[in-house]
């Protein structure tokens, strides 16, 4: 069975390369991180930008974005755009390995605060918003926000169906009105 660990997308007009490290790479994080660093050097990339989600116990409507960078200028610019500095925390997986192997390449790590253990389109939209301004991409995050709303409504409907199915039925035919 062939397993893809990376998906690579190239936007030639903007000279951007997007690399998606597939989750579930346990045990291969270092090899994937090394491949990303090698590719960035091969392409003479100005910067590696890593996007990640971080679970938050808060139920806020919007997601905060945290930044950690080995490039002072990039970090300063992202802080001006509203990101908060990531000072501590445990980062694992490909992102954690990248953080430890990118000293020779300008690297910036953005973490979107998610409010569930499921995919969070609102958090993704916040990341897109920040990247849009930072890189001047002109990308509209509205489709992600719409997707988040649709997903949330489906979850609410499923929860309501589950609650409704647990309620006792008030069916007259089920009542015994005599003994005999």
Kindly give the residue locations of the regions a language model identified.
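N-terminal short beta-loop-beta anion/metal-coordinating cradle
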Residues: 1-21
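Catalytic cores of processing enzymes, dominated by hydrolases/peptidases
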Residues: 57-134, 178
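Short, basic, glycine/proline-bearing loop/turn elements
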Residues: 15-25, 80-84
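Internal, conserved structured core segments that host functional sites
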Residues: 14, 26-74
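Solvent-exposed alpha-helices and their adjacent loops that cap or buttress functional pockets
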Residues: 8-13, 41, 100-103
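Hydrophobic/aromatic beta-strand patches that form the interior of the parallel beta-sheet core
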Residues: 17-19, 49, 106-111
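Extended, histidine- and acidic-residue-enriched regions that form the cofactor-binding/catalytic faces
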Residues: 106-180
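Histidine- and/or cysteine-centered catalytic micro-motif in compact active-site loops
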Residues: 22, 52-54, 112-113
